[in-house]
Amino acid sequence: MAALVAQAPQMGELGEFFLRCFGSFDFDGIELVLPQETFSGERSMRVGDRELQLIEVGPAHTRGDTLVHAPAERVLFTGDILFAGAHPIAWAGPVSNWIAACERILALAPEVIVPGHGPPSETAAVRECKAYFEYLYDEARLRHDEGMTALQAARSISVDRWADWGEGERLVVNIANVYAELDGETEPINALVAFQQMAELQRPG
């Protein structure tokens, strides 16, 4: 990411979009730390005197999406399965997995939900996220059948219900993810192509 931001001034419209998104962050000196343990499905563990449940729900936002549930406290940490007050973005998908993840959260019935982005929330925020993806899936499928590109679909689908959510340009990435699911593609979408589409969607006029 640091290299991309450094090259952004030479990348035209895409570079300008990168700088708007990431220019205020300092990525220098960040080192990737690999996990010491992994799991799949579900795992229980203790942290101090608290029992935690780890629940795999990806791929959706990313391949490794995981919920962390503290059942005794009725608190759930969603990671980036929940963006409170902003459009989510399905980098890995499929969108149907994200909908299933929302259903899993609702079945756990937590009192407090700590999202990956935004303030602490309640289950109403999860229901709204689920409704967003269900609506988007249906609308995108119609336009996919009509032969529209993801960008054309993004420009034609109304998301007025979520007008107060930020980062509306992410819509095109979510639509591209639905298209990939409908076409049977299993690899994550190309990030550079996705950023270019977001930049185009955000372009005035």
Stretches found by the model and what they are:
Residues 5-8, 109, 140, 144-148, ...:
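Sec/Tat-exported extracytoplasmic proteins
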Residues 25-35, 39, 114-118, 171-191:
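Short flexible/disordered coil segments
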Residues 1-142:
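Metallo-beta-lactamase
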Residues 37-38, 43-50, 55-59, 63-64, ...:
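Charge-patterned, long linear interaction tracts outside catalytic cores
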Residues 35, 41, 83-85, 161:
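Glycine-rich, flexible loop/turn motifs
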